[in-house]
Every structure is written in structure tokens, then in C-alpha cells.
Amino acid sequence: MNHRGIPALFLDRDGVINEEIGYLSRSEQVRWVPGIFSLVRTAQARGYRVVVVTNQAGIARGLYTTEEFETLMDWMRERFLAEGCALDAVYHCPFHPVHGLGSWKQDHVDRKPSPGMLWRAAKDLGLDLAQSVLVGDRCSDIAAARAAGLRQAFLKRGTEPASCPDDAILIDTLAEVQAWLESQPEPR
């Protein structure tokens, strides 16, 4: 699926925007990953839409509700605005194929490594996936980026083995992604 339109910077949430703690559900648990606000400001200045794509198995497992997730994301959006940047859209997958409870137990097309959230964002926002990039911290993030035909994928070291991506760029900090964006020609 290739849409001619606006490029996007897709961000996984846990481990990329905020430190991974396992089933984040409240604002007081948030610890920002260093460099996240600067990265988002740079991406937006260069014409990228910033889109969060996040699996949320905590909803499927009954650890928190969709409403609690949305409240937390509203708070996060306010924090980004206070830092002079914005999250243009947030897509989440509340399903889990094994550990989901009731109707949450399913292998949904939106759950990474499937590219469903990326495809929906492209359709909803008029994005050009072939000019878009993704930053994730798991092999499932990279697989979703590849399946959607994204231009580039970055794997933040720490959560998964460095051998999982095929041609993803391994990074230690978000400043590396920011430098990469700054080195690229302006999107058309």
C-alpha cells in the first residue's frame, strides 16, 4: 500500500517515547526517553507528521481500560504541546492473540508485527508510507514497518537482541534518529 502524500515519523510508545516499565497506565509512571521532544520538533519542522503506533496488551489482559489508556494519551499529548511539538495521531491495538480476555483475545491486523495501524494512519492522514520512517524497540515494530513499505526503520537497542532487524538502523539514542532526519533532503 503506497500513498503519495505526507511523510510520517511513526513512533512506538513504550521504550521509545517513554521508558519501558511494563503496562504503563498512569501519568505518574511516565519517564520520558531522553531526546523525544527534540526529535518530534525536528520531524515536524521538516514536514513529517508524528504518529504513535502502539500495541496495548494491558487492555486485552484487563490491567487497564481503553478509557484509562486514552486519558494517559491525552495527558501525554498535552505534555508534547507544552514542549512545543505535537503528536498528530495515536493508533493503538488493544488485542492479544493468547493473553486477551473475552473479545480482546484475537490476532488482529492492527497488532504489530502486522502493519494494520500503519495502513490505517496512511489512509486517515494521507501519508506517503514509502517516505515514512519508524522508531521502535522490538522486532515486531521493524516487521510492521517492513510490511507497510516504510522507507527506513530504527531499532532502539536494549529490549531485543541486535540481530532481529534485517536492515534496520540500530540506535542507542533518539539523537541518532534526529541527526538522520536532519541529514535527509527535505520531503517533497
Report the location of each language-model feature.
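Substrate-recognition element of Asp-dependent hydrolases with the DxDx(T/V) motif
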Residues: 36, 40-76, 83-99, 145
